[in-house]
């Protein structure tokens, strides 16, 4: 049964809140179906936006949409910038939008509220919905770059998200006694996969907005007896500062890391720490296009394979393009394809289970894979994939400036011509408020002129050399 079936685990606890409230699997199933009943009921399947807060009602609506087989949600962060949300609404014309209920949770114009709970408010489109119906087996939509509000979406089938959750259960050896805590946004594919896999195992998840540097987080984690702690590279840097070992987390049995490359010194440090406190440390690789997990390093091999992304997850396989060395993944969790507007949601399976990752790699003699570069202009910032072209366009449009964006994981570099009037402060503030990019990850440089290719396009390799 799919992880959203829920019913088979009955009286077991599925979700826990900061308040101490709990929800069993049976209660979650009833709540999910009840909330889904407040979505538009008609002869065709619908598309909706779920601003995915970390609360019972938002999780229940997500599961209710999956259980219905009729409603396809796009998962979005609850704090998405209004301009980014408006752009997405214009492109995809959702039939419904589910927001939070706080003062910052206003719904775009053209929608009327139909139902509200403590955690969510459901709004329906006022005008007649578009005739384009999302085609089965499409079950879920995710943004390719949530922080910039990219309008390019990943189309995932029901099989993709369920098979990936089952594979994660298998290699992490999750069971009914496991308990995770929400250290990541649930709209982010890594955060979503933690929720999905624990539900697939009949385990439980503690929902909180607290951060790893918060005393309340650690008090909640301790009293909830969590068994796993997950994060992206920037969060593992926080975890180092927070001092995991002195937190007395005796119930902890695993640490899991994804969302970008963790530096080798930090990998060594956390491998040594995990051995000392008696838990396992999993370093993993994935992409939203694979729902999202692709590979992992077995903890027992991490010391010997420190720079590796590991081996393919159960049910999947990895290979290299013989010409370009691009990493190619095959598996049932590969997306159906991309979408850039409402009409694309009626598209067929364009990928046929094959994903060209855009990463360049190599394979060692034992079959472990390593990344050596990228074909595409993407970086990871605080675990979120950022499209450099999107950021560059947003900045150029906002400030009417001649500029270019380059970078590496955990570092975005903005290069402007010296004559640009825009200030560094204005750029950092724009990136913080519009793209949710932490100012400390941004480097701003000015040059007399920017390099261009013969056909008039910005020369990114030359720009990168300028920054060395």
Regions found by a protein language model. Give the residues of each.
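Conserved AMP-binding/adenylate-forming core of the ANL superfamily
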Residues: 11-42, 53-55, 83-86, 156-159
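Conserved AMP-binding A3 loop
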Residues: 24-25, 139-166
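Conserved AMP-binding/adenylate-forming
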Residues: 37-79, 183-184, 385
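Conserved AMP-binding/adenylation subdomain of ANL enzymes
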Residues: 162-179, 187-228
């Amino acid at each position: 049964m799919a992880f959203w079936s829920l019913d088979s685990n009955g009286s077991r606890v599925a979700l826990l809140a900061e308040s101490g409230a709990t929800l069993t699997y049976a209660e979650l199933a009833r709540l999910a179906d009840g909330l889904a009943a407040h979505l538009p009921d008609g002869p065709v399947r619908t598309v909706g936006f779920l601003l995915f807060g970390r609360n019972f009602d938002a999780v229940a609506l997500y599961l209710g949409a999956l259980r219905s087989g009729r409603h396809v949600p796009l998962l979005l962060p609850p704090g998405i910038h209004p301009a980014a949300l408006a752009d997405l609404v214009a492109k995809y014309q959702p039939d419904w939008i589910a927001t939070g209920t706080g003062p910052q949770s206003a719904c775009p114009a053209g929608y009327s509220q139909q139902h509200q709970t403590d955690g969510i408010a459901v709004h329906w489109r006022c005008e007649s919905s578009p005739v384009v119906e999302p085609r089965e087996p499409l079950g879920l939509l995710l943004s390719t770059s949530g922080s910039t509000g990219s309008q390019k979406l990943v189309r995932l089938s029901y099989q993709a998200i369920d098979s990936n959750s089952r594979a994660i259960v298998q290699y992490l050896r999750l069971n009914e006694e496991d308990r995770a805590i929400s250290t990541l946004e649930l709209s982010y594919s890594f955060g979503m996969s933690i929720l999905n896999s624990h539900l697939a195992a009949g385990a439980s998840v503690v929902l909180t907005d607290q951060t790893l540097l918060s005393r309340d987080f650690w008090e909640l984690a301790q009293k909830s007896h969590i068994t796993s702690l997950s994060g992206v590279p920037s969060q593992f840097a926080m975890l180092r500062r927070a001092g995991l070992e002195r937190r007395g987390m005796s119930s902890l049995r695993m640490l899991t890391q994804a969302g970008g490359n963790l530096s080798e010194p930090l990998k060594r440090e956390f491998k040594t720490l995990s051995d000392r406190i008696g838990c396992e440390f999993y370093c993993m690789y994935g992409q939203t296009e694979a729902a999202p997990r692709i590979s992992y390093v077995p903890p027992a091999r991490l010391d010997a394979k420190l720079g590796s992304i590991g081996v393919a997850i159960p049910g999947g396989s990895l290979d290299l393009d013989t010409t370009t060395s691009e990493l190619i993944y095959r598996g049932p969790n590969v997306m159906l394809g991309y979408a850039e507007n409402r009409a694309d949601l009626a598209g067929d399976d364009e990928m046929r289970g094959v994903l060209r990752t855009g990463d360049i790699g190599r394979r060692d003699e034992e079959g472990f894979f390593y990344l050596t570069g990228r074909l595409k202009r993407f970086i990871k910032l605080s675990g979120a994939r950022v499209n450099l072209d999107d950021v560059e366009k947003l900045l150029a449009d906002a400030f009417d400036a001649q500029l270019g964006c380059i970078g590496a994981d955990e570092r975005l570099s903005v290069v402007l011509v010296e004559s640009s009037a825009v200030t560094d402060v204005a750029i950092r503030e724009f990136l913080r408020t519009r793209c949710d990019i932490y100012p400390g990850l941004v480097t701003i440089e000015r040059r007399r002129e920017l390099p261009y290719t013969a056909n008039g396009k910005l020369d990114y390799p030359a720009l990168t050399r300028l920054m060395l």
